[in-house]
Amino acid sequence: ATAEVRDDIMDILNLRDPFVLTTGFDRENLYYAVKRPRDKYRELLSYLKEKEEKMPGSSGIIYCLSRKNVEEVCYQLREDGFSVTRYHAGLSDEERKENQEDFIYDRKQIMVATNAFGMGIDKPDVRFVVHYNMPKNMESYYQEAGRAGRDGEPAECILYYAPIDNRT
């Protein structure tokens, strides 16, 4: 978190002289890649199939910029046989809670979500985070990608880039 955000948290929680641990940005267990595929979905499908072959049952998060993208990607992955669920602000509280629990407790392997998903989520064994679209800013990207590999094991953070992303 930025210094301003840390100060806000301390003020809101009324913390007096807290111990604050600040670490660097480098997490050696995370592999970062930016890809510019001709067909994002085909690239994603290929990536997930390879992941399933090498590491069956791996958990992962796919971040999309819009609810519409979440719905499209989740539907297509389900049609292609993946254990997938979704999360965005357009779902009822009940469905969001159910889908979140399905992911956390490994009833579903893949969460397709907007940035509404993730705050307060601590699932240590997330093996990959894919950004299907460009995130809104670097801070969002770092926070979302940082949900991978919290158990210290190797994890991948993949960003799919397309020129159209600059306009969204």
Which residue stretches match the model-derived regions?
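Helicase motor core with emphasis on the C-terminal RecA-like subdomain
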Residues: A1-T168
